[in-house]
């Protein structure tokens, strides 16, 4: 959270997406990010969510949302039908991350991807000292009820982008530790709790 009580990753994404853009938010949850984009950036926004609860909350916010499983792809959407496709704090929960990321850059001109960094030093120490699966603000679940199935680090994601020829236009590293900005810049894989990437095709 920021000092004003807003989510830092949401603030970053609000800064990335230009006013009036056509946006699709995948795994939009309760619609809080999409609602901010619609209200503050005047985007033409819609969302996709799989949970019944998330759908109800999005509808209550007056958002355009479809109930679908993004692991099945975005076959109903033509190429380049959106300016920005967002996948925030959802990458680790999808069954087929490569399919989802590929579809994002087929359907959208640019992709915004936010994910928790499983190589953060606190995660490493938690596992080393406690011998248990780590729990953090971004990964608050117990091992037996977590929706997360594909954990990755910042180094993992950079390697993925290199392997599949994705252009990284921006990388923003996030942490609740304000004093860690320099350390995040020097060694983000160790000191960033999460990251937000802006991607496009080369």
Question: What kind of feature is each model-predicted range?
Answer:
Residues 4-20:
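Conserved alpha-helix/loop element of class I SAM-dependent methyltransferases that forms part
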Residues 19, 80-81, 107:
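Alpha-helix C-terminal capping/helix-to-coil transition sites in glycosyltransferase folds
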Residues 27-29:
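Class I SAM-dependent methyltransferase "Motif I" SAM/SAH-binding loop
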Residues 32, 36-73:
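Class I SAM-dependent methyltransferase SAM/SAH-binding core
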Residues 73-79:
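Short conserved loop adjoining the S-adenosyl-L-methionine
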Residues 84-95:
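A short SAM/SAH-binding and catalytic strip from SAM-dependent methyltransferases
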Residues 98-103, 110-202:
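S-adenosyl-L-methionine-dependent methyltransferase catalytic module, highlighting the catalytic core
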């Amino acid at each position: 959270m920021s000092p004003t009580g807003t989510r830092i990753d949401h603030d970053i994404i609000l800064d990335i997406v230009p006013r009036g853009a056509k946006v699709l938010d995948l795994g939009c949850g309760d619609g809080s990010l999409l609602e901010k984009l619609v209200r503050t950036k005047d985007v033409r926004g819609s969302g996709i969510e799989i949970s019944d609860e998330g759908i109800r909350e999005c509808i209550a916010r007056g958002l355009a949302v479809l109930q679908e499983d993004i692991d099945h792809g975005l076959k109903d959407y033509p190429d380049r039908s959106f300016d920005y496709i967002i996948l925030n704090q959802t990458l680790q929960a999808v069954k087929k991350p490569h399919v989802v990321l590929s579809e994002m850059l087929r359907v959208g001109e640019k992709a915004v991807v936010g994910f928790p960094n499983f190589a953060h030093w606190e995660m490493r120490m938690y596992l080393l000292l406690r011998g248990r699966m780590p729990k953090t603000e971004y990964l608050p679940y117990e091992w037996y009820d977590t929706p997360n199935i594909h954990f990755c680090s910042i180094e993992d994601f950079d390697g993925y982008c290199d392997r599949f020829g994705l252009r990284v236009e921006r990388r923003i590293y996030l942490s609740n530790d304000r004093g860690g900005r320099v350390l995040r810049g020097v060694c983000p894989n160790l000191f960033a709790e999460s990251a937000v990437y802006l991607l496009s095709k080369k």
